[in-house]
Every structure is written in structure tokens, then in C-alpha cells.
Amino acid sequence: MSSIALGVNIDHIATLRNARNTEYPDLVEIANIAVNNGADFITVHLREDRRHIRDSDVFRLKDNLNVPLNLEIAAIDEMLAIAIAVQPECVCLVPEKRQELTTEGGLDVKNMFTYLMPFVTQLHNHNIKVTLFVEPDINQINYAKKLSVDNIELHTGVYCNHNTQNELNRILEAAKHCYTNKIECHAGHGLDYQSAATIARVPYISALNIGHFLICEAVLHGIGTSIYKMKKVITNPL
């Protein structure tokens, strides 16, 4: 199988920084440590409430990274304008609720189709690739295909929480459907070493996005060591 890419989400480095409103830990420094230890791209989620990542973080990361920046945003005009100004390599459109602790599920592309269309078009007009974060659902992927998005990121949270064969089968079928429809397939949410190794074995998934678990592991083992181990786990799954 071809090597799978690792996207490291550093949102919770910003959470730690913001706890005391300090300038440290520095996100650019952490991002570059991640890259030096196997991260193929860096992911950040600029939320409407700015609970972790700030606007200035996104611009600094874009200006100081030698790997692609993957910017997660809600599909709203404010975030679209920021994305166009930043010019990340890719924007991942995600659902967002102010009271949620983290993203709770995928976009309902079917019901949001007309609403999402101008966002996808404008991002493409500025040469920014577009990913949609969706549940492993064939119907949702069909509507994403109609929007001509570049990538799908499958929500792995349900699988990670329940570890059922039925949910893994949904991911397998969704990844194959992406391949059949010529959409690059990524996956993420809730992944740890064990679940990431399983998802990395799924044919047609080309990248994983992992954040919270790696930051927690970094408290015990250091950010570089944790990312190096994860990259080894997903590129050589048992």
C-alpha cells in the first residue's frame, strides 16, 4: 500500500497557551517540530468563538510552514474571507456549534447543498482545495461529488467511541465510494494509536488527521516522540 499522510492538528497547543493568555507555547515552533517528526501537513480549526486558534495564528503558520496548511472552518462568510486572505493549501468545511466541546459529526451535505455551493466555488476560484467533513455515508458523498470538492474527510468518531465492525464497514464502503467517484479520501476524529492503525489499513484512505490524542501523548512523551510514533504506526500498520 502507498504511504499514508499524517496531518497533525495543533488546536490544543493553542488551548494550553490561551489558558494563561501567554505567548507560549509557540504554535509555529510546535508545528515545525511536528513536521520534523513526520507530520505531512498541519491542521488548525479557526472557530467562530476563537476558543483556541486565533486569526493571527493562521497567518503565521501559513507564512512559516514548509508543508501544506489545512484550515478547518465553518461555512460562513467571515471565515470564507479569512481563508481567501490566508490562502491555505486546503480548506476543510466542518459543522460548528458554539456549545460543543469538539466537532460532533459531519456536514449534512444533502440538506446544505445549495448553501455550500458558493463557498466551494469561491474557494476554488482562489485556487484553494476544498474538503468536506462528512459521516461515512454514501448519500452524503454523492452530494459532495456534485459539488466537485477535492477531498472528503470521513468522521471516524463513532468508530473510535464504539469500535464496532459495522461502523468500520461503513468507513470501508465510504472510502471505496470516494475512490470510485475520484474523490480523495481522508479520515479523522478521535483517533489514537490503535484506531489509527486500523483506519490506516482501509484501502483508498490517503491521509489521517489527528490532534487531541497526540497533544495528550505529548504531555507524557514529548510532541516529537508522539508524532514520530504515530507516523510509524500508520505507515506500518500491523
From Swiss-Prot:
Metabolic or biological pathway, per its Swiss-Prot or TrEMBL entry: Cofactor biosynthesis; pyridoxine 5'-phosphate biosynthesis; pyridoxine 5'-phosphate from D-erythrose 4-phosphate: step 5/5
Cellular location(s): Cytoplasm
Domain of life: Bacteria
GO MF terms held by the record: pyridoxine 5'-phosphate synthase activity
Keyword DNA damage attached: no
Annotated EC: 2.6.99.2
Binding site for 3-amino-2-oxopropyl phosphate: N9, R20, G190, G211, H212
Active-site residues, Swiss-Prot/TrEMBL: H45, E72, H189
Pfam families xref list: PdxJ
Major location category of this protein: cytoplasm
Reactions catalysed: 3-amino-2-oxopropyl phosphate + 1-deoxy-D-xylulose 5-phosphate = pyridoxine 5'-phosphate + phosphate + 2 H2O + H(+)
One term under GO cellular component: cytosol
Residues reported to bind 1-deoxy-D-xylulose 5-phosphate: D11, H12, R47, H52, T102
EC class: transferase
GO BP term, example: pyridoxine biosynthetic process
Record keyword Cytoplasm present: yes
Keywords linked to the UniProt accession: Cytoplasm, Pyridoxine biosynthesis, Transferase
InterPro entries per the UniProt record, alphabetical: Aldolase_TIM (IPR013785), PyrdxlP_synth_PdxJ (IPR004569), Pyridoxine-5'_phos_synth (IPR036130)
Site (Transition state stabilizer): E153
Known function: Catalyzes the complicated ring closure reaction between the two acyclic compounds 1-deoxy-D-xylulose-5-phosphate (DXP) and 3-amino-2-oxopropyl phosphate (1-amino-acetone-3-phosphate or AAP) to form pyridoxine 5'-phosphate (PNP) and inorganic phosphate.
NCBIfam families: pdxJ, PRK05265.1-3, PRK05265.1-5
Family: Belongs to the PNP synthase family.
PANTHER family according to UniProt: PYRIDOXINE 5'-PHOSPHATE SYNTHASE
HAMAP family cross-referenced by the UniProt entry: PdxJ (MF_00279)
Subunit annotation: Homooctamer; tetramer of dimers.
Protein name, UniProt field: Pyridoxine 5'-phosphate synthase
